[in-house]
């Protein structure tokens, strides 16, 4: 019984540490625009077959509203990027009251669909810049 309890506690702590990792990430700038600056965590990119999991941080110059009405100044987005077919899936998003993913998490949303919707990666966007960084050339995209 004691070892089972320890296993559950260890699993929960490991899960929390994995979720907290992006908060202490080394963010690399992707794109800077008037309305937002986009970053990604190079160290957290995880290749799985022909796709890549990545964290994206969006920093805003002034507060905006979440879909539920809370003010936020930054958001962290977890995505799965499909390198071969130029699509991306949003897995989760967290909104923060301060820039660079700091301060209080004011809202979050995780995709709970069995098959999340894929969106096309449009040229000249932060997602196109992310694809270039995480998928690289044809060798990275094919393996």
Name each model feature, range by range.
Residues 1-10:
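Bacterial N-terminal signal peptides that target proteins for export
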Residues 9-18:
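Bacterial N-terminal signal peptides
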Residues 21-77, 82-143:
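N-terminal secretory-pathway/extracellular module detecting exported/lumenal segments
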């Amino acid at each position: 019984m004691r070892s089972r309890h320890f296993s559950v506690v260890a699993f929960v702590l490991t899960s929390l540490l994995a979720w907290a990792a992006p908060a202490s990430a080394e963010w690399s700038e992707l794109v800077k625009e008037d309305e937002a600056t986009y970053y990604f965590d190079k160290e957290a990119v995880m290749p799985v077959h022909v796709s890549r999991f990545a964290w994206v941080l969006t920093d805003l110059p002034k507060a905006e509203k979440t879909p539920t009405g809370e003010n936020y100044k930054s958001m962290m987005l977890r995505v799965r990027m499909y390198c071969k077919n130029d699509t991306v899936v949003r897995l989760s998003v967290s909104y923060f009251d301060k820039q660079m993913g700091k301060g209080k998490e004011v809202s979050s949303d995780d995709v709970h669909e069995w098959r999340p919707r894929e969106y096309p990666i449009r040229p000249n966007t932060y997602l196109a810049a992310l694809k270039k960084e995480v998928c690289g050339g044809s060798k990275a995209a094919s393996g």
